[in-house]
Amino acid sequence: MNRADARRARPAPEGRPMSGPGPLPVRLDPPVDPARDHVLGEPGADLTLVEYGSYACPHCHVAHEVVAELRDRLGDRLRYVFRQRPIRAEAARPAAELAEAAGLDGERFWHAHDLLMRRGPSFAAGELDAIARELGLPPRERGAGPWEGAAARVREDVESARRSGVHLTPTFFINGRRYEGPWDAAALSEALLGSLGHRLHAATLDFARWAPSTGLLLVVATAIAVAIANSSAGAAFTAAWQAPLGLSLGGRGFALPLVQWVNDGLLTLFFLVVGLEIKRELTVGRLASWRAAALPMAAAIGGMVAPAALYLLVIPAGPLAGGWGTTISTDTAFAVAILVLLGDRVPVDLRVFLTAAVIVDDLVAIAVVALFYSGAISLPWLLAAAAVTALLAGLNRAAISAAPPYVALGALLWACLHAAGLHPTLAGVILAVVTPTRPPPDLRALTGQAQAVLEAELRRAREGVLRHGPSEPALRALDAIHDRIESPASKLLRTLDPWASYAVLPVFALANAGVAWVPGALDGRGRLVAAIVLGLVAGKPLGMFLAARLAVRAGLAVKPAAYAWRQLAGAGALAGIGFTMSLFIAGQAFPDPADFRAAKIAIFAASLLAGVLGALVLWPRRSPAAEAEALPAPEGSEVDAAGT
């Protein structure tokens, strides 16, 4: 159901613009070793600043001045470590090797470092040789003096930069953790000294980047809801969620139970996030090409048809027959959390497969809610909703990207859909469709514009004109550049995704997962429980596996060699963790509280069984022979002069 975990859990392959680069490592690898690293300052200082830089990088020369200011501010409390990460410039690697050679030949690294920082970032022909002679180094000949060892040290630093996720220079690590703030001395000093705000920000980022974090929050929220529901406060807890909440004006009002505000209101934000992700996948993501999408699409369709068919086989008719929708969806937060906890037992390609399949799941689940779980349709309000949708589409066509008109019309659309008898969460999906997108920006042009603006402000600062920071025209220009870098749809997704993952879904679990176990809770509802459990635990993996095999046999899809059919079946078993979306559809399908209670128990049991089954199937590692067959032969390559 939620793919934020999936994005954190997998690296993005080339040509995959959906998620940008894969998640970068947060920790320095390897840690600082005073016996190997170049350390400036007290070896036992309590603050450590590590910089990956290049002598041919102009930004590193600016950072050099900032580091000097930090050392003046913090004194003996700070130790500074410089590691080489040569950029793509002709003199970058020779300059790095020169500094390392000076360190090996008489421990003069910092002398060479300062010389190179003063004279760079551009070095004239023969200038590096002149610096080497000034330092008393022997001629640069292969195997002569310290040069061979220096080249090896640069390669080691480049490999360290790769493992630490360094993709630009300079990159800083503070006390072993990646620093992602501004490069000015004040911000770096605040981070080094560990202000409360910085520590809270760092802890929040660490938790959000941990792939199982959303699943963990859902588990905690569910456990709290179940515990309270089965305690002496259970009745009050249930009554609180049923309390009406709304607005009234002049004798007129609009009110809904609190739980309905959660299910119809808050979940609209979630459906907006889902819609934005589906839109991006269909345009530039994993479902943009038939070859990439064929296998997960086939598996997803089989994984929805088979569970629904098994459910209807057990309950073919009657008031409970409408509950088949509870068996067709997957809670990605839990499924991906288990995949991540299994570590390298699960190939990255398998995570990609499951995530793409769930995107199709979500798309169909949205259609199912709209078509099968809406109330009686009011034609006037339906026409009003269509008119609002047309206005939203007009905003898109007019290239209006400001948020307020979309927010206002989105709220109006929600009200029209609610009054029309359709599920109002569809407003989120419609908003996702009409939110503007645009082609990727010309980063070269925008970089030049930003540099021109900032250089003009820098000149004004030197002339003493600026007293209170950049001028208002400069700030407006920088705001316009920033807005152009990211499309409105991407920006909206990036903004709302954490709220959907860490606020909306846990609140939904609190409001809906609290099931009180009472004697006779399942009396007369054994077939309902069996239908849901059978659909999720057996139907999901069976349908996904058979549909995928059929698609491959028919030549419609190709299975990656990185994972075996057994592992695909294990992913199918994990797809049986319905939970949040299953609970949501169950709330629409079973108006009788007793039926809903039994359905919740069945969904809990099925999700638990599916998770255990999937983990057991995926636990065995592939044999070495199978791994050798599955993976392409490694290509020998050396680190190039850019350190990549």
Swiss-Prot record:
It catalyses: Na(+)(in) + 2 H(+)(out) = Na(+)(out) + 2 H(+)(in). Residues 199-644 are annotated as: Na(+)/H(+) antiporter NhaA. The keyword Transport applies. It comes from the Bacteria. The keyword Cell cycle does not apply. InterPro entries: Na/H_antiporter_dom_sf, NhaA, Thioredoxin-like_fold, Thioredoxin-like_sf, Thioredoxin_domain. NCBIfam families: NhaA. HAMAP family: NhaA. This is Na(+)/H(+) antiporter NhaA. The lineage of its organism: Bacteria, Pseudomonadati, Myxococcota, Myxococcia, Myxococcales. The gene is nhaA.
